[in-house]
């Protein structure tokens, strides 16, 4: 009898438990278009983003896929979601959580240009409909996924309308108090995951699933910090310091250093940050970042001056390779200089990369894992010579720790360092079919194709590809606080001065935007002398760029060139000339930052008077008469001219030109022009119309 009663009770308990279990299952409705549906994915039932989200969430959740290919958010769009069968099914599902990803198809010219004013209204109405069937439901609005530049309508409106729709979604979230999740940023650096320019493949869908999973659960993988947070790190002194990272939602985070203790809580997107009070220069701080579950303590932390050193092979050129390199390396003992050396895993030399290398490069995993190191003969030997000499002169002058981050890549193009949004908006033509695009230097394209010869992917990624090094080498720095940037690049863009002129401005302004510092110092090296015909014009374009871009300075290197070698070995003067710009312009030291820089030329009685900046003590570098000046009445027909120093000005004349209209100096690919100032700093070559 007792056994029968026990069995009955167990049966009744089991019967009662089933509905309890069912009501505890959390229903997630994934509402959207073909991206939610899984168009283009071979096995969408297993690999669409909702299917992968189900795997991540587990049995406590029930995920429904209510994606409709071609659906628009707009009620007057060409295929309104609210008129589709999937919409009614989503309502009937009555999700506890509703993830909405709509808006991609609204970029169609049939939709956004005509009905943009209805977008916010229609989105709010859609949200209300889900709230009506489940008043307690949690609404997650997704920023729309990227559309790659390969899309046929990209430049005819799609790119601009895509941005406008993102802003409209933000407005909807503000009004409705819905949560915003970002389906755009995680996919944006990976256009190869969008084979048809719109639909993510399985891997792309996994990124969306992971994004939704973290937003739903608050699980962001625990405490994570930027790659630059290591022992021996250098923090920028004398300025409020942003220390940041990610952690699981609502996790308390405590940051401590030098008696400061700042506390915060990770937000719903897993992000946290604190602002430390300015720290004075020093070299033995301890930085602690803690959550209740995890702790990171960084030892031997310094506070001083932090500079990013970037560009191509002449910035990458190692200290041990330079003139007198062995002596310089043996003397490179300085714990006040710290190096963060970002080396590529594979050299961009004349070889075919293995398939595993190509796969890593496709995933932006080009750089080796590294950490901050004190400057020693061992750590400095393979470090950038230009950066080392720059940092050494700064440290000798400022007497504070100096941190140097170097991510230069040999042969890299200017466009590879420019952010994707800038190129999409202001120079989209350079993105198109980049390995066959003559905006990009033929040598760079040929070398990239050789490295990628074993690739089976239709879309190829490489450090010379537009945007690549920005995405692989700048974004991972996560806006680490810097004082400024030094740059040595241009050899791989000298074939097209006009394109570089546009690209360089995009690069400088884009990097300043990334660091939220419109006045960030940016000092760069003018190309040296070499027997390449286009370099005369290119050097002058660099000079003009310096005049147009504020807070920049240009180190002249033409006197240190090699007529046959693109990699001159005398790097010390170049690094020190960059340091002069920093010491004068950034740290306000009273030293000449540069050699004579052309200001203007005025015609007077068939003679030309040239004025310069930084013209103190003008003379010739070799004791001989000045050489390299030419005059012309008609552009293209120049004659050598005599030049005489008159105080801080130069008088130029020739009997062969009676009415001079144009002047140029040092106008040879490999120039022996010899004008310098009192500090033996060479004048930049130039060309201009005479006033």
Task: Name every feature range the model reports, one short phrase each.
Residues 24-30, 35-124, 279, 299-300, ...:
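Conserved SGNH/GDSL esterase-like catalytic core that processes O-acyl groups on lipids
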Residues 227, 236-240, 570-573, 580, ...:
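Surface beta-strand/loop "capping" patches
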Residues 261, 609, 616-691:
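C-terminal beta-sandwich/jelly-roll accessory domains of carbohydrate-active enzymes
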Residues 23, 55, 59, 78-222, ...:
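Alpha-helical cap/lid subdomain in secreted, periplasmic
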Residues 244-327:
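Extended acidic/polar, glycine-enriched regions
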Residues 224-232:
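Short, solvent-exposed loop/edge segments of extracellular or virion-exposed proteins
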Residues 1-23:
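Bacterial Sec-dependent N-terminal signal peptides
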Residues 340, 347-382, 483-492:
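Short, conserved helix/loop micro-motifs enriched in His/Cys and acidic residues
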């Amino acid at each position: 009898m007792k056994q029968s009663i026990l069995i009955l009770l167990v049966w009744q308990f089991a019967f009662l438990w089933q509905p309890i279990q069912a009501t505890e299952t959390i229903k997630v409705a994934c509402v959207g278009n073909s991206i939610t549906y899984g168009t283009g994915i071979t096995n969408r039932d297993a690999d669409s983003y909702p299917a992968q989200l189900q795997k991540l969430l587990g049995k406590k959740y029930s995920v429904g896929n209510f994606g409709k290919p071609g659906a628009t958010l707009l009620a007057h769009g060409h295929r309104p979601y609210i008129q589709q069968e999937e919409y009614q099914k989503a309502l009937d599902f009555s999700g506890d959580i509703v993830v909405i990803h709509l808006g991609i198809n609204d970029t169609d010219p049939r939709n956004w240009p005509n009905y943009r004013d209805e977008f916010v209204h229609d989105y709010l109405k859609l949200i209300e409909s889900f709230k009506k069937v489940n008043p307690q439901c949690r609404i997650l609005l997704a920023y729309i996924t990227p559309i790659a530049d390969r899309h046929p309508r990209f430049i005819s409106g799609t790119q601009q309308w895509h941005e406008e729709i993102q802003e409209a979604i933000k407005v909807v979230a503000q009004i409705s108090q819905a949560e915003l999740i970002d389906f755009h940023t995680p996919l944006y650096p990976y256009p190869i995951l969008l084979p048809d320019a719109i639909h993510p493949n399985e891997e792309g869908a996994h990124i969306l699933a992971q994004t939704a999973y973290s937003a739903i659960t608050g699980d962001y993988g625990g405490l994570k910090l930027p790659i630059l947070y290591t022992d021996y790190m250098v923090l920028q002194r004398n300025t409020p310091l942003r220390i940041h990272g990610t952690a699981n939602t609502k996790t308390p985070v405590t940051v401590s250093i030098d008696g400061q203790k700042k506390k915060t809580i990770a937000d719903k997107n897993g992000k946290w940050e604190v602002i430390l009070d300015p720290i004075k220069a020093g070299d033995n701080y301890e930085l602690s970042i803690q959550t209740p579950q995890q702790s990171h303590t960084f030892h031997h932390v310094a506070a001083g001056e932090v500079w990013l050193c970037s560009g191509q092979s002449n910035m990458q050129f190692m200290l041990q390779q330079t003139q007198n390199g062995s002596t310089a390396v043996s003397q490179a003992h300085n714990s006040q200089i710290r190096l963060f050396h970002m080396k590529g895993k594979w050299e961009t030399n004349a070889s075919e990369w293995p398939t595993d290398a190509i796969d890593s490069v496709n995933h932006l995993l080009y750089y080796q894992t590294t950490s901050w190191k004190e400057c020693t003969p061992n750590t400095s030997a393979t470090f950038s010579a230009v950066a080392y000499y720059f940092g050494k002169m700064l440290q000798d002058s400022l007497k504070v720790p100096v941190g140097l981050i170097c991510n230069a890549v040999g042969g890299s193009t200017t466009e590879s360092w420019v952010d994707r949004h800038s190129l999409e908006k202001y120079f989209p033509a350079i993105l198109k079919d980049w390995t066959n695009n003559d905006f990009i230097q033929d040598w760079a394209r040929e070398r990239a194709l050789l490295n990628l010869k074993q690739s089976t992917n239709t879309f190829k990624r490489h450090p010379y590809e537009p945007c690549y090094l920005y995405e692989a080498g700048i974004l991972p720095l996560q806006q680490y606080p810097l004082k400024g940037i030094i740059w040595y690049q241009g050899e791989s863009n000298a074939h097209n001065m006009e394109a570089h002129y546009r690209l360089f401005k995009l690069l400088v302004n884009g990097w300043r935007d990334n660091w939220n510092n419109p006045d960030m110092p940016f000092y760069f090296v003018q190309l040296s002398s070499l027997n390449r015909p286009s370099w005369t014009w290119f050097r002058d374009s660099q000079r003009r760029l310096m005049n147009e871009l504020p807070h920049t300075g240009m180190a002249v290197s033409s006197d240190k060139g090699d007529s046959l070698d693109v990699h001159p070995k005398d790097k010390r003067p170049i690094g020190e000339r960059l340091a002069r710009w920093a010491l004068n312009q950034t740290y306000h030291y009273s030293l000449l930052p540069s050699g004579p820089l052309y200001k203007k030329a005025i015609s007077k009685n068939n003679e030309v008077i040239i004025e310069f900046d930084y013209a103190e003590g003008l003379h010739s570098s070799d004791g001989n008469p000045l050489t390299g000046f030419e005059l012309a009445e008609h552009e293209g027909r120049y004659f050598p001219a005599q030049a005489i120093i008159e105080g801080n000005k130069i008088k130029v004349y020739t009997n062969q030109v009676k009415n001079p209209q144009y002047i140029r100096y040092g106008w040879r690919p490999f120039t022996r022009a010899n004008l310098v100032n009192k500090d033996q700093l060479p004048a930049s070559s130039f060309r201009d119309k005479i006033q």
